Amino acid sequence: MTTTKTMLVAFVLTLFFVISSVHCSDGTSGYGITEATKRCFTPAPCTRGLFYCQTFCSSLSAVLIGVCESGICCCILNQ
């Protein structure tokens, strides 16, 4: 009886250890579901020129690139 309880406890602890050590990826293959790669703002940053639009986008995040499209500043995710 004692051996059975010991084996059961050892099995459960081993199972918990194995489950906790498994690393799962939350990424998806292909394009998948990702955050928006482009966000456009009011034309105010582009009225000062492309450099100001780029500065505006990089101030939001270091991975964004600013582009003026039809006078509207769009921040694009740098991939």
From Swiss-Prot:
Disulfide bonds join C40-C75, C46-C68, C53-C73, C57-C74. GO terms for biological process: defense response to fungus; killing of cells of another organism. It comes from the Eukaryota. This is Defensin-like protein 117. GO terms for cellular component: extracellular region. Belongs to the DEFL family. Keywords: Antimicrobial, Disulfide bond, Fungicide, Plant defense, Secreted, Signal. Residues 1-24 form the signal peptide. The keyword Nucleus does not apply. It comes from Arabidopsis thaliana (Mouse-ear cress). It is found in: Secreted.
